[in-house]
Amino acid sequence: GNFHDCQELEMLYKNHSQIPNHCRFFHTDYYTASMVKYSINTFLAMKVTFMNQIYKMYSDHEEHSRNPHPEIWRAFTDMLSADLRVGSSHLQVPGPDGQYGYGGSCLPKDIKAFIGYDKNERLSVLRDVELANTQIRLTGDSKPK
């Protein structure tokens, strides 16, 4: 929206909500805000899909397939998340719903919307992620049968 409206909305949030004082506010237009939201959620969907594929590859290794302990995987993800560029979110396999791949209401909806919005098909990686996740959710494996 316009700068004045954004400032007023920011003050309303700061003065009448539980938003912490350290929360950053960005004044931008609707298109940019939408692109940020879809970019974040589709990136997280890619991260979940990637981690599920890594999990399968890791657990298929003969040493770990004989002894697949959750503690070993947790130590692996702890090492990954120690790199601040990776971070600790969306590394859990299976996910918080106890299933493999991403689910819930946001990530599947947003990746479909972003793919649909991409009329020039620049985001082909998202189509691959959606296909892999569908396979993971159905079978627990990212390889087509």
Named regions from a protein language model:
Residues 1-145:
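Structural/interface elements that position substrates and couple domains in central-metabolism enzymes
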